[in-house]
């Protein structure tokens, strides 16, 4: 991977910054320098974020959004890099709050990412690879064969993190080196063998589990479970076979007992059925005898009474119809007589009316000729009425046409006047219409103003604003610095005073300590006196107090040193702030002059529209008003065009209407002339009204005559029909009366004959009628017959049962039922026992079969498991004493090449032949994850030691050597990742002059075929490296980037 071009927008301190790595190809190494906090490491953060969505430090990607970014400013990073022969472009933006595209307020925009192959920087996209963060991350890992952490360990060495690869654990190193050197085939093979070993172990565990489950199955009773538990593993199969055979023997024994009990059940069932049948016969005999007593003997009197009454009913029943007919005929005969009398009376009245109507008809016949003559006159008048109506209709039409003609002439004059007005209006509007070229020119002028305003004035105004904001910020910082400097001076004076006081106390305590050590007769080491008069006043606590005071003096001295250093820094910062403030004021003045000149040119021709001095809001509003004014003028012009088109359309319509109305006037004259000629030709002068009145009078007389005649004829016809009907009805009633009298006489004779019979039960008509009409005849007859049948049946059934149970004793059914119940229960118990025994046999048989199957399969897989286990132990390091895995062994080979290259080209040179790398012999506590631990062999001590024991400068030298060697070895490896860039963030300040010079030589050596970038504040490196990227602070948290090529 080789960086080509990096663009940062509102990312950290970079508002719109670009790093073009193509400009840095002339020299093996380039330097990134700038003020502290200016954003040097942010360049590395941007590359890491673009590729992996993370930064080099602990900051989240969202926190990299510039603090000065507004809701309209979108944070994004665009990074171009080469991989092989292809140029890739990756664009990424973090989650951020941005202004809504529509309406007010903001919206949370999710993180985005896009990866594509392009033809050149800022060029055409050739292939779109991924368009979301997840897919982009997967594609980058596939392309580089590195994740973010591994990228930072071998390509990007962040600040204060050089020793991460050097001191990382074997698993971490192994993951990185496997990706770099493409040794995943060994990982895949190891994983496959591991999976097969795990699979085979799982299979064997399943075999053991299945066998154990079978031995501990719930089918075994506690005694059998105990036997299986105590038995040796190799004896358990034989024991299960023996237990199965025991169960078979128990089952056969229970089967024999069940068969014997089944025969007993059959025998007792036969005996029970016989006893039950005999008991039923005794019960039936008792029931039949009870029925005979209740239904035959006790009901015999009722039977005799019913028999006697039945004879009377049967005697009277044949006369039932005759009695009914006799009564109906007598009643009907009376009604017929009344009808005959009524018809005779009504017929006499109708005959008188018929004679009267006949005389009236003869009078009407004499008036008929006069009426017919009037009808003929009326017909002639009807023809005259039709002609008169035609004349009146034509006269009315003439009047209507004259009125319509008058209206038509009025409208014609009105349309002619409107036509003249329309022509006048059209002429006026044609003068008011503005050409389209006028508006095109006006819009171009307005757009040019907008372009000048947005493209020149606002950017210049923003420069003025930012400069003034920077001046305010610098003045505030200068003020804060002055306050802090004053406070620091006060603190320094206080610290000096306290320090001097503590020194006095120390002298006092040291004198006291010296006094305490003096011995009588020995000379004082200070004055040489042999007498020591004040030693008895020394306190024992002085020693402890002196120790504490010495600590306080040391702390006070450190504090004083810190304050002095801070005072120096504040003084330096004050000078820098004053210088920056002066420069900013000059810059602001220049920007204001530039803005003034540009604005004067801007309003030269538009002073009446825009304000005298630059005001962004007012200018924006003026431009908007100018746009609205132009739009309003254009709308009015469009409305005028529409009105003109409408008027021209109306003029054409009016011209057509004038023609139509002139033609209509001519047509009216022609129609009126035609109608007057037709009226003269008809020649009728009397009105239709008078003619209709004459005809109506004649027709009314004729209608009244015909109506009277018609009504008279109808009355004659009705009365004749009525008299005829009355004659027929009278004949019918007379015949009916004769028939009824004849039938009444016959029925009376029948009843009289019945009463005269010798066996007659009565001679009273009413009693006979009651018996004949009694509806209980059938019911009483059925009761009598049922009684006879029941009596005969019961006698036969009682006799039959008595014959069956003759000489037999009634059985004790309860005793037999109890015996039957006990026999059945014993049989059911034995059946259940047999089923249980059969189940136990089948279960034991199933267990035995399954055991044999599992053991057979286990024996079959034994050789396969042994081979896989041996292979797995070999590749996982379990078979060797060093416990080195196959994957680690392969990667260790590459690491040895890296260490050998580092020893030969870098570490010896940088450490003056003192150090060299070697692999650790074994891991701590013989752990499994070792094999890639790196030790440092010290030629001065003749012993190897851990990399953790190196100092800061030594650690940097060692880490740099490995990083450089790794880059070289990978470049020379066919399957390795192509590493065409190396970036180092700080660390050179810990090297002495000689080591620094050697490190520079090493960097230049590897920089011959790849890009090497260094961040450093070391002055020697600034002076030595010609190609530089300089990052300057601009105030307000902003920084800019400048490339320097020497």
From Swiss-Prot:
Q: Which UniProt keywords apply?
A: ATP-binding, Coiled coil, DNA recombination, DNA replication, Endonuclease, Exonuclease, Hydrolase, Nuclease, Nucleotide-binding
Q: A Pfam family matched by this chain, by name?
A: SbcC_Walker_B
Which GO biological process annotations does it have? DNA recombination; DNA replication; double-strand break repair
Stretches of the chain forming a coiled coil according to its record: 223-239, 268-432, 468-505, 543-867
One GO MF term attached to the UniProt entry = exonuclease activity
Domain of life, per lineage: Bacteria
Binding site residues for ATP? 34-41
Q: What does this protein do?
A: SbcCD cleaves DNA hairpin structures. These structures can inhibit DNA replication and are intermediates in certain DNA recombination reactions. The complex acts as a 3'->5' double strand exonuclease that can open hairpins. It also has a 5' single-strand endonuclease activity.
Q: How does it assemble?
A: Heterodimer of SbcC and SbcD.
The record's similarity note reads: Belongs to the SMC family. SbcC subfamily.
Protein's UniProt name: Nuclease SbcCD subunit C
Q: Which organism is it from?
A: Lactococcus lactis subsp. lactis (strain IL1403)
């Amino acid at each position: 991977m080789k960086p080509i071009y990096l663009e940062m927008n509102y990312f950290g301190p970079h508002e719109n910054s670009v790093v073009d790595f193509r400009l840095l190809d002339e020299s093996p190494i380039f330097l990134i320098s700038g003020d502290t906090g200016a954003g040097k490491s942010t360049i590395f953060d941007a590359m890491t974020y673009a590729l992996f969505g993370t930064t080099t430090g602990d900051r989240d990607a969202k926190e990299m959004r510039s603090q000065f970014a507004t809701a309209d400013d979108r944070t994004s990073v665009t990074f171009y890099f080469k991989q092989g022969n292809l140029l890739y472009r990756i664009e990424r933006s973090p989650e951020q709050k941005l202004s809504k595209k529509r309406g007010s307020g903001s919206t949370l925009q999710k993180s985005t990412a896009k990866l594509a192959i392009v033809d050149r920087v800022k060029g055409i996209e050739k292939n779109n690879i991924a368009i979301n963060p997840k897919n982009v991350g997967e594609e980058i890992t596939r392309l580089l064969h590195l994740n973010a952490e591994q990228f930072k360990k071998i390509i990007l060495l962040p600040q204060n993190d050089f020793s991460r690869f050097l001191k990382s654990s074997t698993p971490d190193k192994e993951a990185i080196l496997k990706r770099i050197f493409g040794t995943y085939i060994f990982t895949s093979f190891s994983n496959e063998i591991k999976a097969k070993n795990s699979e085979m172990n799982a299979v064997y565990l399943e075999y053991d589990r299945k066998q154990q489950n079978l031995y501990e199955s719930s089918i075994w009773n506690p005694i059998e479970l105990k036997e299986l538990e105590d038995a040796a593993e190799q004896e358990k199969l034989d024991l299960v076979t023996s237990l199965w055979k025991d169960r078979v023997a128990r089952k056969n024994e229970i089967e024999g007992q069940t068969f014997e009990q089944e025969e007993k059940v059959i025998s007792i069932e036969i005996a029970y059925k016989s006893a039950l049948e005999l008991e039923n016969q005794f019960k039936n005999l008792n029931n039949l005898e009870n029925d005979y007593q209740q239904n035959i003997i006790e009901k015999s009197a009722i039977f005799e009474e019913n028999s006697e009454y039945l004879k009377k009913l049967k005697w009277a029943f044949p006369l039932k119809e005759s009695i009914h007919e006799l009564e109906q005929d007598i009643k009907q005969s009376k009604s017929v007589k009344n009808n005959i009398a009524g018809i005779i009376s009504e017929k006499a009245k109708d005959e008188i009316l018929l004679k009267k109507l006949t005389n009236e008809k003869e009078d009407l016949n004499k008036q008929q000729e006069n009426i017919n003559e009037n009808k003929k006159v009326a017909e002639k008048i009807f023809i005259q009425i039709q002609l008169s109506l035609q004349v009146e209709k034509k006269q009315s039409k003439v009047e209507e046409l004259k009125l319509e003609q008058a209206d038509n002439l009025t409208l014609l004059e009105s349309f002619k006047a409107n036509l003249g007005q329309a022509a006048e209006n059209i002429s006026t509007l044609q003068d008011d219409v503005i050409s389209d070229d006028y508006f095109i020119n006006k819009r171009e002028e307005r757009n040019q103003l907008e372009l000048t305003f947005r493209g020149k004035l606002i950017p210049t105004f923003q420069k003025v604003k930012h400069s003034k904001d920077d001046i305010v910020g610098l003045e505030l910082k200068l003020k804060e610095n002055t306050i802090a400097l004053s406070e620091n001076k006060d603190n320094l004076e206080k610290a000096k005073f306290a320090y001097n006081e503590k020194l006095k106390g120390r002298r006092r305590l040291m004198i006291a300590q010296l006094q305490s050590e003096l011995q009588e007769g020995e000379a004082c080491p200070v004055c040489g006196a042999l007498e020591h008069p004040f030693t008895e006043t020394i306190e024992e606590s002085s020693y402890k107090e002196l120790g504490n005071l010495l600590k306080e003096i040391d702390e006070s001295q450190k504090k004083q040193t810190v304050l002095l250093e801070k005072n120096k820094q504040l003084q330096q910062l004050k000078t820098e702030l004053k210088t920056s403030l002066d420069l900013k004021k000059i810059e602001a003045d220049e920007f204001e002059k530039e803005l003034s000149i540009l604005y004067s040119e801007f309003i030269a021709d538009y002073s009446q529209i825009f304000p005298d001095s630059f005001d962004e809001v007012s200018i924006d509003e003026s431009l908007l008003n100018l746009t609205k004014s132009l739009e309003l003028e254009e709308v009015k012009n469009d409305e005028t065009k529409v009105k003109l088109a409408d008027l021209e359309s109306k003029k054409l319509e009016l011209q057509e209407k004038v023609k139509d109305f002139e033609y209509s006037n001519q047509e009216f004259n022609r129609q009126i002339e035609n109608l007057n000629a037709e009226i003269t030709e008809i020649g009728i002068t009397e009105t239709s009204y008078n003619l209709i009145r004459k005809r109506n009078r004649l027709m009314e007389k004729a209608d009244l005559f015909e109506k009277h005649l018609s009504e008279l004829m109808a009355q004659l016809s009705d009365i004749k029909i009525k008299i005829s009907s009355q004659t027929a009805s009278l004949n019918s009633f007379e015949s009916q009366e004769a028939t009824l009298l004849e039938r009444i006489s016959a029925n009376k004779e029948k009843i009289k004959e019945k009463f005269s019979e010798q066996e007659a039960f009565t001679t009273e008509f009413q009693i006979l009628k009651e018996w004949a009409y009694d509806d209980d005849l059938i019911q009483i007859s059925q009761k009598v017959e049922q009684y006879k049948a029941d009596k005969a049946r019961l006698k036969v059934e009682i006799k039959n049962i008595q014959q069956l149970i003759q000489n037999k004793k009634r059985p004790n059914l309860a005793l037999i039922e109890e015996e039957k119940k006990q026999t059945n229960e014993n049989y059911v118990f034995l059946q259940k026992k047999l089923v249980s025994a059969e189940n136990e046999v089948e279960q034991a048989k199933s267990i035995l079969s399954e055991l044999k199957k599992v053991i057979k399969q286990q024996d079959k897989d034994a050789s396969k498991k042994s081979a896989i286990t041996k292979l797995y132990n070999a590749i996982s390091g379990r078979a060797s004493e060093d416990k080195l895995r196959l994957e680690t062994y392969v990667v260790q080979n590459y690491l040895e090449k890296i260490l050998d290259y580092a020893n030969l080209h870098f570490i010896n040179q940088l450490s003056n032949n003192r150090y060299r790398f070697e692999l650790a012999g074994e891991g701590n506590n013989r752990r499994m994850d070792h094999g890639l631990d790196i030790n440092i062999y010290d030629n001065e001590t003749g012993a190897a030691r851990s990399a953790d024991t190196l100092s800061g400068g030594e650690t940097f030298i060692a880490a740099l050597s490995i990083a450089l060697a790794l880059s070289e070895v990978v470049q020379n490896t066919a399957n390795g990742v192509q590493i065409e860039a190396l970036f180092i963030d700080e660390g050179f300040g810990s090297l002495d002059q000689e080591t620094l010079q050697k490190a520079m030589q090493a960097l230049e050596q590897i920089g011959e075929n790849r890009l090497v970038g260094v961040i450093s504040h070391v002055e020697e490196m600034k002076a030595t490296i010609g190609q530089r990227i300089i990052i300057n602070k601009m105030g307000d948290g902003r920084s800019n980037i400048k490339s320097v090529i020497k």
